[in-house]
From Swiss-Prot:
The gene is hmuV. Keywords: ATP-binding, Cell inner membrane, Cell membrane, Membrane, Nucleotide-binding, Translocase, Transport. Residues 5-242 form the ABC transporter domain. The keyword Transmembrane does not apply. Disulfide bonds: none annotated. The lineage of its organism: Bacteria, Pseudomonadati, Pseudomonadota, Alphaproteobacteria, Hyphomicrobiales. InterPro entries: AAA+_ATPase (IPR003593), ABC_transporter-like_ATP-bd (IPR003439), P-loop_NTPase (IPR027417). GO terms for cellular component: plasma membrane. Belongs to the ABC transporter superfamily. Heme (hemin) importer (TC 3.A.1.14.5) family. It comes from the Bacteria. One of its GO terms (molecular function) is ATP binding. This is Hemin import ATP-binding protein HmuV. ATP binds at residues 37-44.
């Protein structure tokens, strides 16, 4: 049985180098998937395959049981929204104007409430009239996240919950805003949006994701519930570091480098 988004033996090669090798994934509607792995593992390439930006050199990617490359660009844009890791805007747009870009050519009366809601959701209500280049990197990242939220929600009016793809969305954010953004992504998933996010922080992934997909050297190394992946000894080999598993008070497992764990004060018995 197919999922909302499927990769079937999907591979991608360029210049004789295989960046992804026979990736099989079934992602159901409303799942929040975190993709983790060391640098160069193929995470961004996989996200671009799943978004339809890249075509697999072998295998297939399908969205709602239809080859993702069979969608016309405008049709695909109304069904999925993607936040890239680095977005450069050199023109002096205001924050609100950037967020409005997510609405495309839809009328202002139709989408103003979506823009207002997105600005509020990312905590930029008071920044709407600021020029984007005057903001910090983290604030700019939040503005672009609001933009893709508007794009996603405009598409929902036509097609129902869509696909949200996030490439290192927390890379420029402080801890508070990392948690806020991850919480927003989780709420999107609970409302039916299918969310796929590349994260460097596997503990953040364990806290918010339904599943963690681990890539290593272009191959699928693990795919499962956060607790299964965190507690799998394979994760130490993938990241090539000594890690220990600990459990938070609410039962969620997390990883610590062994040298940090050894330095923690031991509780008195």
């Amino acid at each position: 049985m197919s999922g909302f988004l499927d990769a079937e033996a999907a591979s991608f090669a360029i210049g004789g180098a295989t960046l992804l090798d026979r990736i099989d994934l079934r992602i159901d509607r409303g799942e929040l998937i975190a993709i983790v792995g060391p640098n160069g593992a193929g995470k961004s390439t996989l996200l671009r395959l799943l978004s339809g930006d890249l075509r697999p050199t072998r295998g297939a990617v399908s969205l709602q049981q239809r080859a993702i490359h069979s969608y016309a660009p405008r049709e695909l844009a109304s069904r999925r929204a993607m936040l890239s890791q680095h977005v450069n805007v050199s023109f002096p747009f205001t924050v609100e104007e950037v967020v409005w870009m997510g609405a495309g050519d839809r009328g202002r009366g139709t989408s103003q409430s979506l823009v207002d809601a997105a600005l509020h959701e990312v905590g930029l209500d008071a920044f709407r009239d600021r020029q984007l280049p005057t903001l910090s990197g983290g604030e700019q990242q939040r503005a672009h996240f609001a933009r893709v939220l508007v794009q996603l929600r405009c598409g929902e009016v036509e097609h129902g919950p869509g696909l949200l793809l996030l490439d290192e969305p927390t890379s420029s954010l402080d801890l508070r805003h990392q948690i806020d953004l991850a919480g927003t992504a989780r709420r999107c998933a609970r409302n039916g949006t299918t969310v796929i996010a590349i994260l460097h922080d596997i503990n953040l992934a364990a806290r918010f994701a339904d599943r963690i997909v681990v890539l290593h050297q272009g191959r699928l190394a693990a795919d499962g519930a956060p607790s299964q992946v965190i507690e799998n000894s394979l994760i130490r080999r993938v990241f090539d570091i000594a890690l220990v598993v600990r459990t938070a008070e609410d039962g969620v497992p997390f990883l610590l480098p062994q040298m940090i764990d050894a330095a923690r004060p031991q509780s008195e018995g």
